[in-house]
A protein has these predicted regions:
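Soluble "head" domains of membrane/secretory-pathway proteins
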Residues: 2-15, 51-300
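Hydrophobic membrane-insertion alpha-helices, especially the h-region
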Residues: 19-38
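Cytochrome P450 fold signature focused on the C-terminal beta-domain
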Residues: 41-42, 127
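N-terminal signal-anchor transmembrane helix
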Residues: 42-53
Length: 300
């Protein structure tokens, strides 16, 4: 009888401890999920397009909450269905020179924007909603902004490359968005390009039709067509357009090897995951060793 009582007591004690451990790990998992969705998440850098700021093998922490975390139907997005993206309230805007992680807006084809939840890029924000951007001699310029924009050393280097014949050997594509021969924009001479802000209005002249066609079709889920001097959105004639979303111009820091807004156009705000903060781990892909000098480095 005494032995049975001891066994029951032992089972009660250890059963309680086991339940507490299970509860603890369940709560830990819930905290991990909630923080990953609403607060901060991690991404691994797959390429050298953001060197020297970010290197291949860097694992970065991305702030989701300051601008507001995104909410959408993940399962529908994984099935590549159209999803409505909502953003929670935040206390900070995305600013020029922020390093942003986002879903690449052209995962399938270059003439239409689509949301691919599994396709992520990281680039530096050069121009924000309401800005007017130009590229002069490979250097970024924003009207009314006197500070630096992007990696100025890389802009100097690209200018020298384009002044020589070396860019041909490196396979650098000089032509840029919107790839119109008459307009003649390039990665050396580009713009001026107005970066649409939510609520801003543009006239539907021949230039704006070309520059903003993909954005308008994505917002409206209607085709933009032209009949002589008439612009049709679906079956409706329009002479101007009011944007529903904010947009950004982004660029890689390694400008001679980065496919960014110079080539594919503007980034819709709903596609932005958040702002890169720090490198929490960095691993050499060849040797497998940790790059301790880069661990916990602030991303600037």
């Amino acid at each position: 009888m005494e032995t049975n009582d001891r066994q029951k007591s032992w089972l009660k004690v250890w059963g309680g401890r086991l339940l507490n451990m299970i509860f603890f790990f369940c709560m830990l998992f819930v905290v991990y999920l909630v923080s990953g969705v609403f607060i901060v998440t991690s991404f691994k850098i797959p390429s050298d397009s953001m060197e020297p700021s970010l290197q291949t093998g860097d694992c970065i922490l991305v702030d989701k909450c300051s601008k507001g975390a995104r909410l959408f139907d993940v399962f529908a997005a994984l099935e590549k269905k159209e999803v409505k993206i909502h953003r929670m309230p935040g206390w900070r805007k995305f600013n020029r020179n922020d390093v942003l992680v986002f879903n690449f807006p052209y995962p399938g084809r270059w003439d239409s924007i689509a949301f691919d939840v599994m396709s992520y890029y990281v680039k530096r924000c050069i121009a924000v909603p309401g800005d007017t951007l130009e590229i002069k001699d490979c250097h970024y310029r924003v009207k009314g902004h006197d500070g630096y924009l992007g990696n100025t050393a890389a802009q100097d280097k690209l200018q020298k490359l384009l002044d020589s014949e070396e860019f041909v050997n490196r396979g650098i594509v000089v032509e840029s968005y919107p790839f119109d021969k008459e307009l003649g924009w390039s990665i050396a001479e580009f713009g001026p390009l107005y970066i649409p802000a939510k609520g801003s209005v543009v006239e539907m002249d021949s230039l704006n039709r070309m520059l903003y066609r993909n954005l308008i079709e994505w917002e409206q889920k209607e085709k933009l067509t032209f009949r002589r001097d008439t612009v049709l959105l679906g079956d409706s004639v329009i002479s101007r357009y009011c944007f529903r979303e904010n947009y950004y111009f982004v660029s890689g820091d390694k400008m001679e090897n980065s496919k960014d807004s110079r080539y594919w156009g503007l980034l819709p705000e709903p596609f932005i995951v958040g702002r890169a903060l720090r490198i929490w781990k960095s691993k050499d892909d060849r040797s497998g060793s940790i790059k301790w000098g880069r661990v916990w480095k602030k991303i600037e």
